[in-house]
Amino acid sequence: IGFITTPSILAFSKREIAISKKNYKAFLLADAESGRILYQDRIYENNYPASLVKMMVALITIEEINSGRISLNDNVIISSWASKIGGHQVYLKQGEKFKLSELMKATIIGSANDAAVAIAEHVYGSVKVFIKKMNSRAKELGMLKTSFYSVHGLPPGKNQKIDVSSAYDFYLLALEVLKHPKFLQWSSTRLDSFRKGTFQLLNTNHRLIKSYHGMQGMKTGYHRKAGFNLVSTAIRKGQRFISIVLGAKNSRIRQKITRFLLDYGFENFKKYDLNYIGESISLSAKIEGGTVGSVPLKVAKSVRILLSDIERKKLRILPKIPIKTKAPIKANQNLGNLEYWLNDKMLKKVHLQTEFEVPKQNILFVITEMFTNLNETN
């Protein structure tokens, strides 16, 4: 999905805060609509996601809700095991009953580990089965560096394995999660309540949600080995970016790098309207055996591409049209493509269509043409 470009580091050196490789393990900035990666460092290296794993918990649960197998209104009875999970929690007690919607809020907004376990047990009957589904779903998404061993992301206990992933893999997961508005509704909520208002849920990303215009989450993660992680998304005037920071030294650096990346996106890239649906272009296709020798072409759909000003100047639009096409040809028939290239990467491809119908020559047409040509020569 998408491709990688690397702007000059000078683009960041002029900023107030320099990004130092000592302060983080990986970062990534991507355009959410096209999937194009705009800036990155060490995105394929193995890292520990910590609580970012709850993004996969949320995705699987939302997909099961959408399938109709479960509902946000389901009552979830808390097990003994879920009540014993430590770290970030909402202090669930064995035998308590909560709506699945409440536990989803606690997991996404408050990063509650006990709520994540309760959700997993409800959805598939056991945490073990849920983790198996997490790994199979990761494989489907192309998350090749990812191995999940928990639903909460806590440091492993004795004889347990630690969750492993990469910035690139969580970029793939973020793209999939963004297909579900309900997740953003939760992840962009700064403050909510739990247990009938007796417990407050403060978003673990509350500082950026409050201070960064357009911020909508998505998920924080931390433990000592992992460092400070954040998958975030922000939208302004219809333009959405995804930012990923892994292994930051502290939460302050995590926030600053996130601001860097998102600011870089919003300040340096914009969508260019390059072609419009039905737009005629100065190209035609040669037709063999038709009532005319060629047919003009038009663009099948509108084309908008996110580019920097410099990239716009470098963009090449290349037509790919068959040398000859045999009649008959229908009106609005796909006949070739326009390809939009930046350096050695194709950003987009759109079909070209015929402006009108071109019937096949018949005997009457051939005779008529012969007499016409004779009259013209006499």
Named regions from a protein language model:
Residues 1-4:
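Bacterial N-terminal signal peptides
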Residues 143, 161-378:
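Domain-terminus/edge residues, biased toward the C-terminal soluble/receptor-binding domains
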Residues 9-172, 177-181:
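Active-site-adjacent loops and short helices of periplasmic peptidoglycan-processing enzymes
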Residues 8-9, 311:
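Compositionally biased non-globular segments, especially hydrophobic aliphatic-rich helices
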